[in-house]
Amino acid sequence: SSDIAEDKCTLSLDSSGESLHRRGYRQEAVEAPLNEVLAAGMILMTGWKGECDLIDPMCGSGTIPIEAALIARNIAPGVFRKEFAFEKWNDFDQELFDRIYNDDSQEREFTHKIFGYDNNPKANEIATHNVKAAGLSKEIILKIQPFQQFEQPKEKSIIITNPPYGERISTNDL
């Protein structure tokens, strides 16, 4: 697109295509899913980088556990995208892109676990599908469990969640 204002012209090229907040691993979602970038931001604001277990007691479609695993393993967030708009540019260098895109030299081992709980069997099914699509089944353990049955872990861990709110939830749903 271009914009002309008085004697200035701004030319913008779409290099990403689909919005970058759509990471590419989400196969399905629950009602009102958490934005992937917001989930990553919530995790990063805690300073957590994988040095202990992480628990999401109301994980819905698994966005927080998946983003946490990506952060813990230092996996680039765009790695699941099928395509970028810049791949259609005339001067696109496929060999260079493949070399950068497939470089996993900065990835880390993750020796802890990420736990995602939800009381909704359908949400658990969706989260399981998304975790598998992201290739993170080794790092993330999902379980159908009501919030009231949550027990404080014995080991140091961090809890991050996005509880349902508003009309989507009633006391009976917890």
Language-model segments: what does each one mean?
Residues 34-151:
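Conserved S-adenosyl-L-methionine
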Residues 1-25:
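Non-catalytic substrate-recognition/targeting regions of SAM-dependent transferases
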Residues 56, 162-163:
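Hydrophobic alpha-helix-in-membranes signature
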Residues 148-160:
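A short acidic, Gly/Pro-enriched loop at the edge of an enzyme's catalytic core
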Residues 19, 165-168:
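A short, flexible beta-alpha/helix-coil linker loop
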Residues 24-34:
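Class I SAM-dependent methyltransferase Rossmann-like catalytic core
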Residues 68, 163-166:
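Proline/glycine-anchored alpha-helix kink/cap motifs
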Residues 170-174:
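Glycine-rich S-adenosyl-L-methionine
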